[in-house]
């Protein structure tokens, strides 16, 4: 069974934590991933080679691997270079996710995707923010497309995710699996994404984002207290 068939119609849980969080320890990320898989997740999405390696030892479902890297001269940060992809693959990722937006990057997108295919033997998930960028990524060889970066780039920051219209456009115009990722905040929303044609649904913050969730609750309660 190929990777796309394994995940079709299922929930992919993004198990990540801020670098300064106690949850960012590899063994804790691995425990999150294992808990998600035990409850039915068909795959997990993991950041950094250290976390991928720990998760690989804990679960046998597909791992979408990435490495967020801050490069001073470039806005792209999700697996921006081939060297990053090499480390992600070596750690045990089954598919490599990367930023496929039109923003400036250290290496040409098509070259990066081709090298991942040819030298690492791994499929590529293109994280995009628009139909145009998705189409360009597929033309460059991307195997899957995710709506991951909608709402997080300069051209889309004015609109919070998810974008149901973008998802519908991607499903209509592209022939590769489309993963709905970003802004999915309830089971109802996840089901809606599948109903619109998403191949699978990725959920992170609403399931594993303890740090952000606590901050949101605290801010809401503080605002209410300040008004009283």
From Swiss-Prot:
Coiled-coil regions listed: none
A Gene Ontology term for the protein's cellular component: cytosol
Pfam families, sorted: NanE
Lineage top rank: taxon: Bacteria
Any one GO MF annotation of this record: N-acylglucosamine-6-phosphate 2-epimerase activity
Assigned EC number: 5.1.3.9
Catalytic activity annotation: an N-acyl-D-glucosamine 6-phosphate = an N-acyl-D-mannosamine 6-phosphate
Cited Gene3D superfamilies: Aldolase class I
Family indicated by similarity: Belongs to the NanE family.
NCBIfam families, A to Z: PRK01130.1 (NF002231)
Name of the protein this chain belongs to: Putative N-acetylmannosamine-6-phosphate 2-epimerase
